[in-house]
A protein has these predicted regions:
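Short alpha-helical "patches" and their helix-cap loops
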Residues: 5, 94-99, 153-163, 464-470, ...
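Electropositive, gly/pro-rich neighborhoods at or near active sites that engage anionic ligands
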Residues: 52-203
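Intrinsically disordered, low-complexity, compositionally biased regions/tails
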Residues: 8-11, 141, 209, 230
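Anaerobic metallocofactor- and corrinoid-dependent redox/one-carbon enzyme cores
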Residues: 15-44, 48-49, 56-57, 180-536
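Short, Lys/Arg-enriched N-terminal segments with co-localized hydrophobic residues
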Residues: 1-13
Length: 536
């Protein structure tokens, strides 16, 4: 699987790859050969595997060693680096691995070998599946923990679990023990999402419902993609009074809902649609794009001189903004490019001209009494959560079609970049409650769960007894940790698509179906009929 050979100088010459961590993996079995579907080259994939192997060695060294905050940060950076569409740069991956090797020796005088990841890829399919669920889950969780760390919040239980999970991934373990670890991953990730929610709201206030235009005003502007609200705040501050407008892209859209970010009048609107459309939407764009996290795709010639990276994101030959967060090169490029000569009208994926965001748990639950009343009066019959990661697969039109088919007496919660499939639809409202409520970024699945738990409490029932159905889309590893949290919380009958993950073996899938009622999506008509019949 993870094939390579050693050259005369002792360096690995990486000829072939094996990677199946994202939804678009080739043939829904795994990317092999020289390039993955995401654009990642074989050598990059293998360097990332080596990086994970080094982290497992570091976790072993930390068990009876003396890890510090620096060690903790390296673990988060290492895991985050290997998330899909974060890092395509071999040099930064190798540099990070070298740092990890040095840290291993610093915290423990004993020698700890790096783990060979082919031990996982070549294991029994159920063991491989369960270890993959944990590994990909902690990759996603590391992103949330890193964003929290940047804002000054950490949690010892969360941090310690990364070490525990890495060590157990590198050990022989029974399927039962690994299934228990899978559930623990979901438990700890829920705590991690709560930590990030607190970090974001402490820093920027509780999100408020906000209408966001999709028109790009004439003049210089910067497009900001990714999830890092801290980077957004710093850029807004550095561009204040310079005549440069700021537009969100993809998962940065929820920034518009935070009061402390809304204070900046040059935070104008949202550029484009889902991340998967960036290569066409950024074609000849007269402005720079700043990637703060995933998803960056292979950068095309028509805009490569305008793309900047920061934080964990890295791509060969692009300008990277370092830890000093001096965005001067981005600002200068915006002035140089000049923006559009006239206002440019853009639309959402369904032709809409505005979207809304800011319906996090605080905003929605402030209307809980009204929502409960509407349910009791029969004016709201059902709630759907339609969201998750978006992607390029044509089958993802399922989510748009499903939303369009939902009855007018139902409410749709949405979140993450999967929202772009539906967030510009005009589905009206129910006595002032919009039928589409955008809860935020992928980590704001925490908000959706808090809303569900509060409604269950108000009705005196369990979450699974609510008129609520989760219809989720997945793409990368943050979706994995969210799914594991939902399973840990005992939320059942989740519809998952557009495909079942390649790393979920038939045996493990059978457990998820039997124990949790996990259901692969079929057609919108079939699934909606089944849902409404079951809840009636």
């Amino acid at each position: 699987m993870n094939l390579c050979h050693v050259g005369q100088n002792g360096d690995y010459i990486m000829n072939e790859m094996f990677c199946f961590q994202c939804q678009q993996t080739a043939h829904n079995t795994g990317c092999e050969g020289k390039t993955g579907v995401c654009g990642k080259k074989a050598d990059t994939a293998n360097y990332q595997d080596e990086l994970i192997g080094a982290l497992i060695g570091l976790a072993r060294a930390a068990e009876n060693g003396n890890p510090t905050e620096k060690t903790d940060e390296l673990v988060l950076k290492g895991l985050f680096t290997t998330i899909t569409n974060v890092n395509f740069n071999n040099e930064t991956i190798k540099k990070l691995k070298t740092e990890i090797e040095k840290e291993k020796g610093r915290i423990n005088s004993e020698h700890f070998e790096d783990y060979d990841m082919t031990n996982i890829w070549d294991a029994h399919e159920d063991v491989r599946s369960l270890k993959s669920l944990v590994l990909f889950g902690i990759k996603g969780m590391a992103a949330y923990a890193y964003h929290s760390l940047v804002l000054g919040k950490t949690d010892r239980e969360v941090t310690d679990f990364f070490y525990k999970a890495l060590r157990l991934i590198g050990e022989d373990a029974s399927p039962d023990a690994l299934l228990e670890l899978v559930m623990e991953t979901g438990k700890v990730n829920f705590k991690c999402m709560a930590m990030l929610d607190a970090a974001n709201t402490d820093a920027y206030g509780d999100p408020v419902p906000t209408t966001v235009p999709l028109t790009i005003e004439k003049g210089p502007f910067i497009v900001v993609s990714g999830h890092d609200l801290h980077d957004m705040k710093l850029l807004l501050e550095q561009t204040k009074g310079k005549g440069i407008n700021i537009y969100t892209h993809s998962e940065m859209l929820p920034a518009h809902g935070y009061p402390k970010l809304k204070e900046y009048p040059h935070l104008k609107g949202n550029f484009g649609t889902g991340w998967q459309n960036q290569q066409s939407e950024f074609h000849n764009i007269p402005a720079p794009i700043l990637f703060t996290t995933n998803c960056i795709m292979p950068v095309r010639q028509s805009y490569c001189d305008r793309v900047f990276t920061t934080s964990i994101v890295s791509y060969p030959e692009l300008v990277h903004i370092g830890d000093d967060k001096d965005f001067t090169p981005v600002i200068e490029k915006a002035i140089e490019c000049g923006g559009y000569d006239e206002d440019k009208e853009m639309t959402g994926m369904n032709g809409g001209h505005i979207v809304t965001t800011g319906f996090a748990h605080n905003a929605v639950l402030s209307n809980a009494e009204k929502i409960v009343k509407l349910v009791k009066e029969g004016k709201i019959k059902h709630f759907f959560l339609i969201g998750g990661c978006d992607g390029a697969s044509p089958s993802r039109s399922y989510y748009t079609d499903f939303a369009k088919m939902t009855p007018p007496d139902t409410i749709i919660l949405t979140l993450a970049c999967g929202k772009y499939r539906i967030n510009d639809l005009d589905l009206g409202d129910i006595e002032g409650i919009p039928r589409i409520l955008d809860c935020g970024q992928c980590n704001d699945a925490y908000s959706a769960v808090k809303i569900a738990l509060a409604l269950a409490d108000a009705f005196g029932c369990g979450v699974n007894d609510l008129p609520l159905t989760l219809v989720l889309s997945w793409y990368e590893q943050k979706a994995v940790c969210i799914l594991l949290s939902l399973l840990y919380l005992g939320i059942k009958n989740i519809y998952l698509g557009p495909t079942i993950p390649a790393f979920v073996s038939p045996g493990v899938l059978n457990v998820l179906v039997e124990k949790f009622g996990l259901t692969p999506v079929d057609t919108p008509e079939h699934d909606l009929s089944a849902i409404m019949s079951a809840k009636s």
